[in-house]
A protein has these predicted regions:
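PLP-dependent amino-acid enzyme catalytic core
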Residues: 4-349
Length: 349
């Protein structure tokens, strides 16, 4: 039987360019597609869904890329992976690398959330802190891999990161049984966005779907390079500052491809304030038990902002890319923890 005659697989791993035997034994993917009644009724959007990739083994969607990178490394007898990260990609590669028996050299900005640093160290990564920011960590990791060897996993630098992340699109299609009208995703470097497009494009080329979804790229107002480039066509470096550390990037490494995809397929890009992001995070948690980090909750905040322009019967998927426990400091900014202690119930107000 030739390849073109084979039935199309429902298994996202079959869409990847490395044989199954090389993948480490760690349960990445197959994350739930939530349909929380309280939220779809609140917004009067009966087909509102949430893809919770914070339930991947290390707590973020980045595990999808790390899984493929690890498999590629094992197939090609590579024993060390080098990566720069704002936090999630690093802890992801460290965790998946541990399952694959790989050494991981991790470069993080010194401002990375402590939870992500501790998680990476628990997995056994060799951690190096860059003095300035993610962009500096990225540059240092490239220098390291060129000087000392090892495969560099960096987002937008290693093509396996886009390939790995495309599996989330295939899962969304499999779980819904159709392609959604709208997908909302937070964006920093642009690789998850490009991965989403790649997955749906693969399905389109295989005639599994007849159209692409409208993808809404959500950026923080303090880290909005792709939003600015949508009108200017250029990327100008501007210091990033946002409560959503996972999408905090001065100059997106995958910016031009992300921009090309958005324009080619009728995508949209909007920005949000820190208040909008944190408010959405709190609402997600308190309304249906979905505790996502600020960068992930930004996608939901984007839906809230854009829903006025959408038909209420359209199928909308909000992609939640990371677990809330990744960044407790940011989550605590709009909640008040009790300071008073009691000895008896009589002291309750």
């Amino acid at each position: 039987m030739c390849i073109r005659d084979r039935p199309i697989s429902d298994d996202p791993l079959d869409y990847l360019p490395v044989e199954r035997e090389f993948f480490p034994d760690i349960p990445v993917g197959n994350t739930p597609l939530w349909h929380p009644e309280r939220l779809f009724k609140k917004h009067d959007f009966p087909e509102l869904y949430f893809k919770d990739d914070g339930l991947n083994p290390t707590g973020s969607l980045k595990d999808r890329a790390s899984l493929l990178v690890a498999a590629f490394a094992k197939k090609n007898y590579i024993d060390e992976v080098v990566v720069a990260s704002t936090g999630n990609a690093g802890s992801s590669m460290a965790g998946v690398g541990a399952a694959a028996g790989l050494k991981v050299k991790l470069f993080l900005p010194k401002t990375a959330p402590p939870a992500k640093m501790i998680q990476s160290l628990q997995y056994g990564a060799d951690l190096v802190l860059a003095e300035k920011n993610y962009d500096q960590a990225f540059a240092l990791s490239i220098q390291y891999s060129k000087k000392f060897g090892g495969m560099n996993r960096n987002t937008a630098y290693n093509p396996m990161t886009i390939e790995g992340k495309k599996t989330v699109s295939i899962e969304i299609f499999n779980q819904l049984g159709r392609v959604p009208e709208h997908v909302f995703v937070s964006v920093g470097d642009g690789v998850i966005l490009s991965g989403l497009y790649k997955g749906f494009r693969d399905l389109l080329q295989l005639k599994q779907i007849s159209r692409m979804p409208e993808i809404h790229a959500i950026q923080a107002s303090g880290s909005s390079a792709i939003f600015r480039a949508m009108s200017s066509g250029e990327f100008q470096e501007q210091p990033a500052e946002t409560v959503a550390d996972s999408i905090s990037v001065n100059t997106p490494s995958n910016g031009y491809l992300a921009l090309k995809n958005l324009k080619a397929y009728g995508g949209h890009c909007i920005t949000l304030t820190a208040k909008e992001i944190l408010s959405a995070q709190k609402e997600l948690s308190s309304s249906c038990g979905l505790f996502s980090e600020p960068a992930a909750a930004a996608a939901y905040a984007g839906f809230i902002k854009q829903k006025q322009y959408l038909h209420s019967n359209s199928t909308c998927v909000v992609l939640l890319t990371g677990n809330g426990l990744k960044d407790i400091n940011s989550a605590s900014k709009i909640i008040v923890t009790p300071s008073k202690t009691i000895n008896s119930l009589d002291e309750l107000n």
